[in-house]
Amino acid sequence: MNANPKFLSADAHVDAAAVAPLPNSRKVYVTGSQPDIRVPMREITQADTPTGFGGEKNPPIYVYDTSGPYTDPDAKIDIRAGLPALRQGWIEARGDTEVLDGLSSQYGLERAADPATADLRFPGLHRNPRRAQPGKNVTQMHYARQGIITPEMEYIAIRENQRRAEYIESLKSSGPNGAKLAAMMGRQHPGQAFGAAAFGANALAEITPEFVRDEIARGRAIIPANINHPESEPMIIGRNFLVKINANIGNSAVTSSIGEEVDKMTWAIRWGGDTVMDLSTGKHIHETREWIIRNSPVPIGTVPIYQALEKVNGKAEDLTWEIFRDTLIEQAEQGVDYFTIHAGVRLQYVPLTANRMTGIVSRGGSIMAKWCLAHHKESFLYEHFEEICEIMKAYDVSFSLGDGLRPGSIYDANDEAQLGELKTLGELTQIAWKHDVQVMIEGPGHVPMQLIKENMDLQLDWCKEAPFYTLGPLTTDIAPGYDHITSGIGAAMIGWFGTAMLCYVTPKEHLGLPNKDDVKEGIITYKLAAHAADLAKGHPGAQVRDNALSKARFEFRWEDQFNIGLDPDKAREFHDETLPKDSAKVAHFCSMCGPHFCSMKITQDVREFAAQQGVSETEALKKGMEVKAVEFVKTGAEIYHRQ
């Protein structure tokens, strides 16, 4: 047996809270053109409108679901075995890959043979790694440029549409007022898309498989989907699709274990993490990553230079191209879907950071800057970029070109070092695209609000619309402990301007490693930012969920308000702090205004009065005002009265 029984029983589990379905929700699957294209969504059941408000049916709404099999009661979850290989059949059917006899990374072979790591290795089903056949290119971009719509692309189109058309049809058939209800619930404000696809206010605009293929072929979107991570559910990152969010996890030299990191991953995807980056820098990086990938239904990203540095005992100057290359192959054969590679940190840019307030704050950037200065040579990442592309396209690993010179304070925002690196990333993007390798560009950082759009505009210009992936940006530096908020502001703005994926920031940013509660707080904050950006862009159907919650709020359907929201648990908890009884869940008021001052209750009273008098709501309001005016004069025409 190659796994310690104590580890398996004590740590290798999924927290029960991470696998329970969310309240009034169930996992549903939408089948595509072939039986094995089964796209997961979360169906949220709603109560009927109370009789006093019309008594109409409220059909379920459907929302994007990143939780994988974990919230499916029918799934058998055993993280010691890993998840089912969802894409295995699609990969094999293309006939352009080969299964290797074993690992081809020297370090991977050493770890597999090391008895000291036997107790920590993933014990589940082991597949030999897969690689492109000689002369073949297995990237989704390559297929797209050949005019091929892959099952992954069809899966994504279904997923992005979130059954909007079916929801509108169910509204139309809900009763005599169905057509009116469908028009109301499907309405959304026109967006301002800043050059992205102009969907207008059309909630029913459909994302087609052909649209997905075209965006991938143009380089405006990526599908991170390593052929060695068949467990992943296909997703897309691009500004003409729903804004995505990434959650960072990972151990350090001083804290965390494999079990904790798997737990954080499942927790992050429960609350909406579209991808997860494993930024481990402590012990057992290789083993930790294997456990995470085998159990992850979302793409996994890494920063390979972190592990390469561990291999040279933390001495940046001892890094070599050969060590880094072996690390890329090691991680690609495990199934990492995208690599952050800081190839834009060039020797000529390092002196430009000398006058900064906060210097170089990127770990990867500082590692490469130190190497360049120690050898007074150009970065080996930049020099060997074409060779890196050859590795990427053999496994379909996507580039996340790292912003190693991003500003670490608003003082340093948009300076010469940051923008010089961005130009280089644009040049590297063109090289990667020659190889049909998928690329996204990482962005800042710390940027005040008035400079955010300039960042987005320059990235679109210099990087030819490759997807932008930003950390925030943080819009002020005065709030340690609240940087999920300072960055959420910037994230919403830059998402609106065109960023495709937002890297979450937790309350622990700059202070320490996040725990599970911090992960959830960061995820929810960034789901809000991403959704606000979708609304502002006018993305098809973005307002459906808002409309459903607003209707539930107006009709005092408290449980539906909780359940449609991003965090039903917190909403219910806050409500119950002041109105804990079950009777309060059907009351026509909350603790904010009480029973006599609820604006929505007053509106309902006006409507009832209008119906009783046989007049319009406007006439009812006018009559009510006339009655109150007479009453005011009779009581002395004084604004205030002593009781």
Swiss-Prot record:
Family designation: Belongs to the ThiC family.
Example GO biological process: thiamine biosynthetic process
Source superkingdom: Bacteria
InterPro entries hit by this protein: ThiC, ThiC-associated_dom, ThiC/Bza_core_dom, ThiC/BzaA/B
Subunit record text: Homodimer.
Gene encoding the protein: thiC
Assigned keywords, A-Z: 4Fe-4S, Iron, Iron-sulfur, Lyase, Metal-binding, S-adenosyl-L-methionine, Thiamine biosynthesis, Zinc
Lineage start: Bacteria, Pseudomonadati, Pseudomonadota, Betaproteobacteria, Burkholderiales
Pathway: Cofactor biosynthesis; thiamine diphosphate biosynthesis
Residues binding substrate: N248, M277, Y306, H342, S362, R363, G364, D403, G404, L405, R406, E442, Y469
Enzyme class: lyase
Name by which UniProt lists this protein: Phosphomethylpyrimidine synthase
Cofactor: how and how many bound: Binds 1 [4Fe-4S] cluster per subunit. The cluster is coordinated with 3 cysteines and an exchangeable S-adenosyl-L-methionine.
TM stretches of this protein: none
Presence of keyword 4Fe-4S: yes
